[in-house]
């Protein structure tokens, strides 16, 4: 089951999270890092490791003496070519981004008349479109959050969907996504977490389609949240429209170098091997959470969405024990019953704390 919320513009887009003690816009701008303090065991943020790999740190550090130099066309081309080779695309189908989130901030340049966003999902697309005065309709999926293309408005000329989706972790079939294509419509697929799925079987990143825009993040996989790196894949025409209003030199040399390095064959192979290990770890974590009464949403992302009795009370209890998880009620389509936890090797600590919470009868 699902329903459609909208049309709304401005802060009214976010009245589904009015239970928060913040403004609706602030609730939508809430992200997992706000739950994390120094020394906390972090299950709230979906960055893979505590720091980038040493080889990447060395490569970026070697460029520090060159920071007086403006980014060159060659720097941009090296980044584009690495991405193009990784996905079997051409250079002019690649747009380096300041994180995948910049891609959402640029969507208003496509001048959509009616945008549809499949939710629960990352909140930035709705914020960016609303800020530009563009009507955004939420297509709200009900548990188990499986995509039903029939409920996306036929007249939507921009459709945004995540795959796998943050925060639900659900991985939609590529055939379902392709069903969303329509004449005059651009389909935007947020694949920020696609490279965490072994083999990436449902990805559209390798498909040269004139009406499909794929957004990718390197921030999470390579632990570069402080640098902000990602890219878009699309037709040259769509990318030109997307960047019609964009600052000059949008990415610095460190960002462009990171994109090229993280899309090199050896790095891609390392990330793929890590994705296999992560999938096994996720299965163990899911079993552990279910053993203490959590209802876990079936998914394939590097995080787990689950609902549990008195989730808000549990979150506060975990926080008192130095454990951070992500609240779910700031996402349109979720409520206070839901929590999201990143897949971490330390998952037994989280499960043990939940078990202790339950043993106490839900009391601190």
UniProtKB/Swiss-Prot annotation:
Query: Is DNA damage given among the entry's keywords?
Result: no
Keywords, A to Z, come to: Aminotransferase, Cell wall, Pyridoxal phosphate, Secreted, Transferase
Q: Name one GO cellular component term.
A: extracellular region
> Which GO terms of the molecular function aspect are on file?
histidinol-phosphate transaminase activity; pyridoxal phosphate binding
What are the required cofactors?
A: pyridoxal 5'-phosphate
Modified positions (N6-(pyridoxal phosphate)lysine) in chain numbering: 220
In short, the EC number is 2.6.1.9
Q: Which reaction does it catalyse?
A: L-histidinol phosphate + 2-oxoglutarate = 3-(imidazol-4-yl)-2-oxopropyl phosphate + L-glutamate
What is one GO biological process annotated to this record?
Answer: biosynthetic process
UniProt cross-references to Pfam families, sorted A to Z: Aminotran_1_2 (PF00155)
Induction details: Up-regulated during macrophage infection.
Q: What superkingdom does the record give? A: Bacteria
Entry keyword Transferase: yes
Q: Where in the cell is it found?
A: Secreted; Secreted, Cell wall
Q: How does it assemble?
A: Monomer.
Instruction: Give the UniProt family note.
Output: Belongs to the class-I pyridoxal-phosphate-dependent aminotransferase family.
Functionally, this protein is described as follows: Aminotransferase that catalyzes the conversion of histidinol phosphate and 2-oxoglutarate into L-glutamate and imidazole acetol phosphate. Might play a significant role in mediating histidine biosynthesis during infection. Facilitates mycobacterial survival and virulence in macrophages. Rv2231c is recognized by host TLR4 receptor at the macrophage cell surface to regulate downstream signaling cascades. Inhibits macrophage activation and production of pro-inflammatory cytokines to dampen innate defense. Can inhibit macrophage apoptosis.
Kindly give any further remark recorded in the entry: Was identified as a high-confidence drug target.
What protein name does the entry list?
Answer: Histidinol-phosphate aminotransferase Rv2231c
């Amino acid at each position: 089951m699902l329903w459609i919320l909208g049309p709304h513009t401005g802060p009214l887009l976010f009245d589904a999270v009015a239970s928060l003690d913040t403004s609706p816009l602030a609730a939508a701008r809430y992200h997992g890092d706000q739950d994390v303090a120094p020394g906390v065991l972090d299950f709230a943020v979906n960055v893979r490791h505590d720091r980038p790999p040493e080889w990447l740190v060395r490569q970026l550090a070697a460029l520090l003496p060159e920071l007086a130099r403006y980014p060159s066309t060659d720097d941009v081309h090296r980044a584009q070519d690495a991405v193009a080779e990784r996905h079997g695309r051409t250079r002019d189908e690649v747009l380096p981004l300041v994180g995948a989130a910049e891609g959402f901030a640029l969507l208003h340049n496509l001048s959509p008349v009616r945008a549809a966003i499949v939710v629960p999902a990352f909140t930035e697309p709705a914020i960016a479109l609303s800020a530009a005065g563009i009507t955004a309709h939420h297509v709200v999926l009900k548990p188990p959050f499986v995509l039903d293309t029939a409920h996306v408005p036929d007249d939507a000329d921009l459709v945004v969907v995540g795959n796998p989706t943050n925060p639900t972790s659900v991985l939609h079939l590529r055939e379902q996504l392709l069903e969303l294509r329509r004449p005059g419509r651009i389909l935007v697929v947020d694949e920020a977490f696609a490279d965490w799925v072994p083999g990436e079987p449902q990805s559209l990143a390798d498909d040269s389609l004139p009406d499909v825009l794929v957004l990718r993040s390197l921030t999470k996989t390579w632990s570069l949240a402080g640098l902000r790196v990602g890219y878009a894949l699309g037709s040259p025409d769509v990318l030109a429209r997307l960047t019609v209003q964009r600052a000059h030199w949008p990415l610095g040399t460190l960002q462009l170098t990171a994109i090229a390095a993280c899309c090199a064959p050896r790095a891609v192979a390392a990330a793929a091997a890590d994705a296999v290990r992560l999938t096994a770890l996720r299965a163990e974590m899911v079993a552990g959470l279910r053993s203490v009464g959590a209802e876990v949403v079936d998914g394939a992302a590097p995080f787990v969405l689950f609902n549990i009795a008195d989730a808000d009370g549990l979150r506060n209890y975990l926080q008192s024990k130095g454990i951070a998880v992500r609240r779910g009620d700031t996402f349109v389509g979720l409520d206070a019953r839901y929590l999201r936890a990143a897949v971490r090797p330390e998952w037994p600590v989280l499960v043990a704390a939940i078990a202790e919470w339950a043993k106490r009868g839900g009391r601190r």
